[in-house]
């Protein structure tokens, strides 16, 4: 299985500043020119919400302050400017190889 290592495990960012979350895959998640890495946001008591798919594509209805980048094994989620409602746990997920796997999560606190 592909192992996804997220960092940091938690971070605290001031309102209006930038949050950066990294995800490193144990092997490439690229196929035929696309990177099969997705990012989810989860708040307590709610199911995960898809933010970014295929590394850099913003899901419909998600604010443009969320952005994703990367390819191969190294990926990044940026949130800028951070808003209070962004406090949540964020997960990367690869969908290149079955079983699809998730990172261990990054908890974002807004200061």
From Swiss-Prot:
PANTHER family in UniProt: IMMUNOGLOBULIN LIGHT CHAIN
Region (Framework-1), start-end ranges: 1-23
Positions of the UniProt region annotated as Framework-2: 39-53
GO cellular component entries: immunoglobulin complex
Keyword Lyase applies: no
Region Framework-3, residue ranges: 61-92
Spans annotated as Complementarity-determining-3: 93-101
Keyword field: Adaptive immunity, Disulfide bond, Immunity, Immunoglobulin
Region of interest (Complementarity-determining-1), residue spans: 24-38
SMART domains per record: IG, IGv
Annotated CDD domains: IgV_L_kappa (cd04980)
Keyword presence, Endoplasmic reticulum: no
Any GO BP: adaptive immune response
Pfam families assigned to the protein according to its UniProt record, in alphabetical order: V-set
Region of interest called Framework-4, as start-end residue ranges on this chain: 102-111
Region (Complementarity-determining-2): 54-60
Superkingdom, natural source: Eukaryota
Source species: Mus musculus (Mouse)
Protein name: Ig kappa chain V-III region PC 7043
Disulfide bond annotation, renumbered to this chain: 23-92
